Amino acid sequence: MSQRITIDPVTRIEGHLRIDCEIENGVVSKAWASGTMWRGMEEIVKNRDPRDAWMIVQRICGVCTTTHALSSVRAAESALNIDVPVNAQYIRNIILAAHTTHDHIVHFYQLSALDWVDITSALQADPTKASEMLKGVSTWHLNSPEEFTKVQNKIKDLVASGQLGIFANGYWGHPAMKLPPEVNLIAVAHYLQALECQRDANRVVALLGGKTPHIQNLAVGGVANPINLDGLGVLNLERLMYIKSFIDKLSDFVEQVYKVDTAVIAAFYPEWLTRGKGAVNYLSVPEFPTDSKNGSFLFPGGYIENADLSSYRPITSHSDEYLIKGIQESAKHSWYKDEAPQAPWEGTTIPAYDGWSDDGKYSWVKSPTFYGKTVEVGPLANMLVKLAAGRESTQNKLNEIVAIYQKLTGNTLEVAQLHSTLGHIIGRTVHCCELQDILQNQYSALITNIGKGDHTTFVKPNIPATGEFKGVGFLEAPRGMLSHWMVIKDGIISNYQAVVPSTWNSGPRNFNDDVGPYEQSLVGTPVADPNKPLEVVRTIHSFDPCMACAVHVVDADGNEVVSVKVL
């Protein structure tokens, strides 16, 4: 018998997302992903100076702020053919790597972990046994019986008070929760420790960016960070050493806690290495430029089709015509006019709401395609592209997670299993581990270049008063490939479009009626209790949705009431 469930809104994400599923014999047979806000930021920046756009568009989201700012700056620099000083590139790279580290840690612990961890079960744990379980896989100094006892007492106090606070909402006791009490206790302890680690990542961003969220140091042509090692109120030696101290602390947590916890979750939920397979076409752009023209990068980019790593096609730069010409957005199933596929430079954002319809329009998110195909972007795509490109560091980081998984289970983990819900999470962890190397590398590069006497961080842009210029700023954001598309005419912005990662992944059916990545990933998912569809939420959360980026403007009521309807 067929059932219909609606989860509206999906919580523990950024923004507003509705998921509808049809369930046949306890398994999802069809799914619809609906963004329930409209983003009009593109309209706001029209007729403005292109140098102002980055400051405005980073307000698209309070989480992904840095990435939108940097992508917008790159778009303007692309349009105006500006060479960026390498010191500015190093500073931007450090900010991006720290921001992404923060984002990945927040996702795993605060947004996703509670889909796998039963908080109440931790009350039955033995703190000493929990500590013993981690010996041989982690040297983290807070994995002690004393620390786990403190955390357990905190949980007891919350339960006794009748107010669970941040742990108030969850499917505790759900039959799909499988972790032993000790592992649940470990996870809760690391959840709380991650809050402090996030602060260290944000300190790196704020020390260079002026503040976070919404950094202030970017400029079309570089960064507003004057360098003088002996000066005051500038980027001096003392501030650089302070930044380095936080970079080192981040690396310890990522390697000894985050990486281990990922392997532990996979070890106890191996069936989720076979569920959640999405679009299986993967797209990622090169990132962390080391030259002034965004032509040389530390991370490679590329495209993989139909889950076949041998189909890998490299994307070598942000001006790669193969990449630029392949991207279109359609609105056949979105609440906009102009339904046919459009290239972003010619894209329109004219709302046309006419109600929710299974076979018609049902989302404020557009549907992007790459040469007509639905693709997935994000850390899984990024990892698979780097594996296909033969990047040794990526393989090594993945091998480290697999080794822990193998030690816990006695089983190996193959690349084919990564096209899955847990594959998204593993890809994000691999990315975060690699980012620690990027932070160290780019910090050293900055110090070395300053030592050579190069203190340049900005070149003044020349914006012609007449003529039309097009630019695109690509960026590998925490959730995947981000692009801002800018058209400058007679010195001001005449058109602007942002094609964001969660648009690629949460998009509705495209112009050819092919389902989007979220929708495809849910098909075949078993649901034990339609009133508590934890399994559906697990897969959606594994993508780390940011609907505030994908769409933008709340409804008139502004109510945030979670409901699960079973029809």
Predicted regions located by residue number:
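Active-site bordering "gate/hinge" segments
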Residues: 1-479, 489-490, 500-567
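Catalytic-core signal marking the mid-to-C-terminal active-site face
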Residues: 494
